[in-house]
Amino acid sequence: MLPLGVVIPTKNSMPYLPRHVEGLRPWLDLASEVVVVDSFSTDGTVDFLRANLAHPHLRFTSHPPGLYASWNHGIAQITSRYVVLATTGDTVTREGICRLVEVAESLACDVVISNPTFCDLSGQIQPDLQWPIGDVIAMLGVKQPRRLHPFEAVIFATVNSTDALTGSSASDVFRTEMLKRYPFPTDFGTSGDAMWGLMHAAEVAWGVVPERFSTFLLHPTNASIAEKRSFLTARRADAVLRAAMDAWRRSGAITEQTLPRALWEDLMTWLTAYYDAKAAFDQNRRNPVPWILNPSAWRNRIRRKRSAAQLQRLKRVALFRKWQ
């Protein structure tokens, strides 16, 4: 048995549960405890899990709808050293779970991330999404598990800020105490895990595993309209990162030697330019006139592309500069 708790968040998840339970069975006996957090399902989700999920320390709890609030509620129930968020439809192998926990222990990590294989609803393998974890593995040439330096985590989170550094939570393990100290934010719509990575990139210990042993199911979101809309009024990633960096420099998590202020300001300048251009282009696309016929839209699209290219250039400078 591993020092691992499992949180299974559900909300009218019945279409994905047969596949999900089938994926859990080969390794669930390794877990010390299992907590199902259901958000008032009306489609038989809880009944199905009660009938088909077996574990000596299985508990059911309920929480009002809200993706990350439900995650936090489930994590609060876990007493094991580590936790995996087994989101419905996503799977991981027995060997993979053991590997993630082993790396967390051996490298003293707060979170260990890995890249899943992407599948559609029919089970067919799909092309990779360009997630931050893939960028980390490719850019650093990761061939075996390694722990990221805090400045590396900050750079990858910054340059890939439109996605979550954690990738798929079902492909990772987290130190439970760390998630209780730094819960997922609930005011960023469906991007709470991405913003969590930005907020805490430098103050948690990240481990990276290059092997693949999990799957991520590509399916429509189950988020409520209110949850989706909350992102529209949330702070942007550049504002979140500026506030976080101020705190990291005060605490010493990031120093002038590891990430010079001038280089960071260049990154922030281009990140802000990227989000300004993205916001303008998104507005162009909402107009009745097709954006392709709008010269302003083309200019904003080019600005966005140029800003993204500059962020990639600065990423290479930051990662591979020669430290004094």
PLM region spans:
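Catalytic core of nucleotide-sugar-dependent glycosyltransferases
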Residues: M139, R212-P220, I225-E256, K278-P290
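A conserved acidic beta->alpha catalytic loop
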Residues: D38-D47, T87
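Conserved donor NDP-sugar-binding/catalytic core segment of glycosyltransferases
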Residues: I97-A138
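Conserved nucleotide-sugar donor-binding catalytic segment
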Residues: A138-S230
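Acidic helix N-cap motif at the loop->helix transition within catalytic regions
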Residues: P15-P18, D43-A51, E95
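Short aromatic/hydrophobic "clamp" motif used to bind/position activated sugar donors
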Residues: V83
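Short, well-formed alpha-helical segments that are part of the catalytic scaffolds
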Residues: N12-P26
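Glycine-rich, basic loop-to-helix element that forms the pyrophosphate-binding segment
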Residues: S62-I78, T88-T91
